[in-house]
Regions:
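A short acidic, often aromatic-flanked loop/helix-cap motif at beta-alpha or helix-coil junctions
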Residues: 25-29, 87-89, 103-104
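Residues that form or immediately flank small-molecule/cofactor binding pockets and catalytic motifs
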Residues: 23-25, 84-86, 152
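Histidine-centered beta-alpha loop that forms part of the nucleotide-sugar donor binding/catalytic region
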Residues: 55-56, 83-85
Length: 155
């Protein structure tokens, strides 16, 4: 919890906008229904117009539950699936967000807050920047972030 709080602070997310639960790590499949109920309640309370979830092909068991139960809970809401290349067999790269240098610096700083993951190659600054360059190249800009468009609702 300490790491996510620090990362959110770097991103400018107010502590009162961060909602954390105590589901045990790597055991989300056992709590699938409870997680769905939390999300349904959040949908009712917040009524978001966009929800960003792990992409539908993320193989990490906890991410997979969040992605699929999130789809069920927010099915009447626009949804994007974020990219975690080390966990995804595939991702449909259909939504791009152009990033500027300050955005990328902020992302690098936020990822550095996850000190317990610092030994992993994907948590390093070089990987984060390289992926942003790759995604930017795909759409003709310097940096970008990709999302899978799970559901897009225009009203």
């Amino acid at each position: 919890k300490k790491e996510v709080k620090a990362a959110c602070a770097k991103l400018g997310i107010a502590p009162n906008n961060l909602i954390l639960h105590d589901f045990p790590v790597r055991r989300f499949p056992e709590f699938r229904q409870d997680i769905l109920e939390v999300m349904v309640q959040l949908n009712s309370t917040l009524a978001p117009n966009l929800v960003i979830l792990p992409n539908q092909n993320d193989t990490h068991q906890d991410h997979n539950v969040i992605s699929h139960e999130g789809f069920r809970a927010f099915k009447k809401t626009s949804m994007l699936g974020y990219e975690l290349p080390w966990n995804s067999l595939t991702i449909t790269t259909t939504g791009f967000v152009v990033l500027e240098e300050p955005h990328l610096d902020l992302k690098v700083d936020a990822v550095k807050c996850y000190e317990s993951q610092s030994f992993r190659g994907y948590a390093g600054e070089e990987f984060v920047r390289s992926l942003a360059i790759t995604r930017g190249t795909q759409i003709g800009c310097r940096y970008a972030e990709v999302f899978e468009v799970t559901r897009w609702i225009i009203s």
